[in-house]
């Protein structure tokens, strides 16, 4: 464990969260839409709207022992969206901090890679069996809709980063993103 500012967490969470290294992908189709997965949060997202529990996230997941971020990203894409032959682009962003919308709150250390698919055909039939939280569905988001959406998209700044990448401006160093709840 590292020295972290866990004091800002909701009162019902443990003060010392376990750390989880995670790899995720910004998955683009040929039309430059971004694939996201909708999950159901285990606790209210917005105290003013306790019924609002849906949030959108990129495909990806935790590293297995000895696994690199790149290898984990490829494995997760196979498990979650059925994509096995994929060219992984560069790591374009990082997001480190406490995340408490999943069943198992954690200090997440996430790395995000770019993936461009030749079509929008994905197989999500195994997605629900690999996830801690209920999966509500998947969606290919047009980037303008993603940027204008009032829905909870994690992490903050994802829509802007996706638009930047789609326009051809791929960061040469990973940018830092933050959780909506940070």
What feature does the model see in each segment?
Residues 2-58, 70:
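N-terminal strand-loop-strand
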Residues 17-19, 50-55, 103-109, 130-135:
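A generic structural micro-feature
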Residues 25, 91, 111-113:
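A structural signal for short, well-ordered beta-strand segments
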Residues 28-34, 42-43, 64, 94-98, ...:
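Short, charged/polar surface micro-motifs in flexible loops or helix N-caps
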Residues 37, 66, 146-149:
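Residues that scaffold the ATP/ADP-binding catalytic core of kinase and kinase-like folds
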Residues 53-56, 119-123, 127-182:
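Nudix hydrolase/Nudix homology domain
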Residues 58-92:
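The catalytic Nudix box helix
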Residues 96-126, 139, 164:
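Active-site-adjacent beta-strand/loop module that shapes the phosphate/pyrophosphate-binding cleft
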């Amino acid at each position: 464990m590292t020295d972290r500012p866990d004091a800002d967490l909701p009162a019902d969470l443990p003060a010392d969260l376990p750390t989880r290294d995670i790899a995720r992908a910004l998955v683009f189709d040929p039309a430059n839409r971004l694939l996201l997965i909708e999950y159901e949060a285990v606790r209210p997202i917005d105290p003013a709207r306790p019924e609002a529990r849906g949030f959108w996230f990129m495909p990806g997941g935790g590293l297995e022992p000895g696994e690199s971020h790149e290898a984990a990203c490829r494995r997760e894409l196979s498990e979650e969206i059925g994509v096995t032959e994929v060219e992984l682009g560069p790591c374009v962003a990082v997001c480190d901090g406490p995340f408490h919308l999943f069943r198992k709150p954690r200090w997440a250390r996430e790395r995000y890679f770019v993936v461009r698919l030749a079509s929008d055909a994905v197989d999500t039939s195994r997605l629900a069996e690999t996830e801690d939280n209920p999966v509500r569905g998947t969606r290919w988001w047009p980037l303008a809709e993603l940027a204008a959406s009032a829905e909870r998209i994690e992490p903050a700044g994802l829509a802007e980063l996706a638009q930047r990448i789609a326009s051809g401006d791929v960061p040469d160093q990973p940018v830092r993103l933050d959780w909506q709840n940070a």
